[in-house]
C-alpha cells in the first residue's frame, strides 16, 4: 500500500477539525449571545407597527354550500386529444 504524504495528512486533519467545528457550531445555543436581539412575539411587533389585530376581521368560510366537482366537463373535455 502507498504511504500518505505529509500534505495528505494535513488535509485530512484539517477536514476533521473543520467538521468537528461546524458540528459543534450547529449545536451551540445563542440565547445569551450579546449580538442576538431579544425575542419579540408577533403581537408586540404588530403593536409597534401600530397595526391592531382587533380591527381586522377573520373571514372563514364555514358554510355548508360547497360543491365538489362533478367530473370532466363534457363541453370542454368531450373530444379525446389528438394522437401523434
UniProtKB/Swiss-Prot annotation:
<keyword id="KW-0964">Secreted</keyword>
<feature type="glycosylation site" description="O-linked (Ara...) hydroxyproline">
    <location>
        <position position="72"/>
    </location>
</feature>
<protein>
    <recommendedName>
        <fullName>CLAVATA3/ESR (CLE)-related protein 13</fullName>
    </recommendedName>
</protein>
<dbReference type="GO" id="GO:0005576">
    <property type="term" value="C:extracellular region"/>
</dbReference>
<feature type="modified residue" description="Hydroxyproline">
    <location>
        <position position="72"/>
    </location>
</feature>
<feature type="signal peptide">
    <location>
        <begin position="1"/>
        <end position="29"/>
    </location>
</feature>
<dbReference type="GO" id="GO:0030154">
    <property type="term" value="P:cell differentiation"/>
</dbReference>
<keyword id="KW-0325">Glycoprotein</keyword>
<keyword id="KW-0732">Signal</keyword>
<keyword id="KW-0221">Differentiation</keyword>
<dbReference type="InterPro" id="IPR039617">
    <property type="entry name" value="CLAVATA3-CLE"/>
</dbReference>
<comment type="similarity">
    <text>Belongs to the CLV3/ESR signal peptide family.</text>
</comment>
<feature type="modified residue" description="Hydroxyproline">
    <location>
        <position position="69"/>
    </location>
</feature>
<keyword id="KW-0217">Developmental protein</keyword>
<feature type="region of interest" description="Disordered">
    <location>
        <begin position="57"/>
        <end position="84"/>
    </location>
</feature>
<keyword id="KW-0379">Hydroxylation</keyword>
Amino acid at each position: 500500500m502507498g504511504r500518505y504524504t505529509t500534505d495528505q495528512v494535513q488535509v485530512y486533519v484539517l477536514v476533521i477539525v473543520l467538521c468537528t467545528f461546524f458540528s459543534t457550531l450547529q449545536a451551540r445555543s445563542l440565547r445569551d449571545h450579546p449580538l442576538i436581539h431579544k425575542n419579540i412575539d408577533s403581537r408586540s411587533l404588530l403593536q409597534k407597527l401600530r397595526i391592531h389585530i382587533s380591527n381586522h376581521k377573520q373571514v372563514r368560510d364555514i358554510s355548508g354550500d360547497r360543491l365538489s366537482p362533478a367530473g370532466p366537463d363534457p363541453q370542454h373535455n368531450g373530444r379525446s386529444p389528438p394522437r401523434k
